[in-house]
Amino acid sequence: MAKLTVKDVDLKGKKVLVRVDFNVPLKDGVITNDNRITAALPTIKYIIEQGGRAILFSHLGRVKEEADKAGKSLAPVAADLAAKLGQDVVFPGVTRGAELEAAINALEDGQVLLVENTRYEDVDGKKESKNDPELGKYWASLGDGIFVNDAFGTAHRAHASNVGISANVEKAVAGFLLENEIAYIQEAVETPERPFVAILGGSKVSDKIGVIENLLEKADNVLIGGGMTYTFYKAQGIEIGNSLVEEDKLDVAKALLEKANGKLILPVDSKEANAFAGYTEVRDTEGEAVSEGFLGLDIGPKSIAKFDEALTGAKTVVWNGPMGVFENPDFQAGTIGVMDAIVKQPGVKSIIGGGDSAAAAINLGRADKFSWISTGGGASMELLEGKVLPGLAALTEK
């Protein structure tokens, strides 16, 4: 990566501004999944071990009006982070003003401060989300000229707390998490060890058009599963029963199949049910066609075997999107089968592109078997599309 990283700058005695991604799920004020906090620890620990004073910025959820602030405070995150670091985390509970400035100026080397939810600034004219220049300049003024971006999850957005601060500091550098995310995903797509197989699932073709187009050029094979299978089926005139379909994307699906030259591998059977919820019958289809009055909710056993074969010998695998409705035990065999086929390949570099696939790997007990699980759904999708991420582009060149 041709950008400066946190290891390239002198941090001792400096007030170091850090964009982290602490956008964690909360239920009744309790954090239900703290993976993103854990993922940021190496960078935070490195800064304080080097004698820096870490000033952390993060958003949490969406805040559009004053009433939205309730339940969106980073206070529970500050407490969780303090427990993980084994030291106090200063939390003034504001995003600007004299109280925040005084708390920052009182910091000593090795201390950590967390600014309140950056999206509180969205209540008045969406200043954070629209990258208000004055806000970026103000936040930049709170530090000593060094900004560390470690929030891969928002790297595809140009906000005041990433791009805005970057534009107003002497050095904007990547943290360890951001560096790893870029290294794993970009290298997998741009300079993969071959055979390189991509697996794309999820419900909508529309979400993945750019990704499929880019990966058809880069990968040796692209396997398709999940709900978007049925849009590809219908585009070929295959019966899909009541399965999910994007009627307005049939031409796109047809064009992708024609362009693919056999690289696009579709399922050959499905697990079908007579309703999405409250079904009374679940069965495997004979072939591709889904029965009348039924809908496909997972790939079937023949497809699992076919995908297993397509993955044999793969050296690089990128997976984004489950094969079926994996939250339901009746429809998780496809996702489990594909995960197991990936991780059993000897010497494979296996990467999960965030979102539902990451949740599936974690919930189904396979997370530790993958080389890398991305922390950013949207950002990893844009990298897989070959797009330039604004948060990354704003960093200082080496």
Curated annotation (Swiss-Prot):
Q: Does the keyword Ligase apply?
A: no
PROSITE patterns, per the entry: PGLYCERATE_KINASE
- Entries under Pfam families matching the protein: PGK (PF00162)
Which EC numbers does the record give? 2.7.2.3
- Keyword presence, Nucleotide-binding: yes
List localization entries: Cytoplasm
- Subunit annotation: Monomer.
Q: Which family does it belong to?
A: Belongs to the phosphoglycerate kinase family.
* Name of the featured protein: Phosphoglycerate kinase
Q: Which organism is it from?
A: Streptococcus pneumoniae serotype 4 (strain ATCC BAA-334 / TIGR4)
| Gene that produces this protein | pgk
